[in-house]
């Protein structure tokens, strides 16, 4: 056997063993292991092999992007029944953005599994954020094709959803959404907003709002609209609750 073929065979064997351990780690066994390997195959690796032992992961990345958006959207829709469409969109964007996907990928050491060409390897491709984010999406696409949406949901329930519950993305929410998220996380009860006062002429109206938790006042706020007053009340409530933590 020519040395190059021997080296490639040894390389493949090493990675097959790594993929076996990876599946054991996540508790999921692929029916079609070729899909799993394809998810981690960068185009640079395919370009350096004439016979193309695997397809690259770009098509799986395309599919995984859509599957990830769908599943995260469904989770947020169910978890935050009072959150507006705009806030849901903003929160979803923070969860599926590149830095977040890189964080998820690094948590499972995705970089160590990627099949790379020599040039990409030498230039640090294994740690490149865009590459890792793409691999995470490709893995979601492969998992969907191999086992369906239910298994994808179960995987995200272990890796992604807990971070939402821990408040990792609260910084992109408005004050009312942040307060709702904090209360839901602690299981403390129901939040209600009341407009206590409207004052001033019609062209310069001022509203005063109060937010309560289980009928206990948490914060007061004022603003030129009911929405602004509620946001300010929520901001004061958040400040108080965080001081107590």
Curated annotation (Swiss-Prot):
Entry keyword set: Cytoplasm, Endonuclease, Hydrolase, Magnesium, Metal-binding, mRNA processing, Nuclease, RNA-binding, rRNA processing, rRNA-binding, tRNA processing
Residues at the active site: 65, 137
EC number: 3.1.26.3
One GO term of the biological process aspect: tRNA processing
SUPFAM superfamilies on file: dsRNA-binding domain-like (SSF54768), RNase III domain-like (SSF69065)
Cell location: Cytoplasm
GO MF annotations, alphabetized: double-stranded RNA binding; metal ion binding; ribonuclease III activity; rRNA binding
RNase III domain: residues covered: 19-148
Cofactor: Mg(2+)
Transferase as UniProt keyword: no
SMART domains (UniProt xref): DSRM, RIBOc
Residues that bind Mg(2+): 61, 134, 137
InterPro entries: dsRBD_dom, RNase_III, RNase_III_dom, RNase_III_sf
Reactions that this protein is recorded to catalyse: Endonucleolytic cleavage to 5'-phosphomonoester
Protein family membership: Belongs to the ribonuclease III family.
Assembly, per entry: Homodimer.
Function comment: Digests double-stranded RNA. Involved in the processing of primary rRNA transcript to yield the immediate precursors to the large and small rRNAs (23S and 16S). Processes some mRNAs, and tRNAs when they are encoded in the rRNA operon. Processes pre-crRNA and tracrRNA of type II CRISPR loci if present in the organism.
Protein name: Ribonuclease 3
Organism, scientific name: Bacillus anthracis
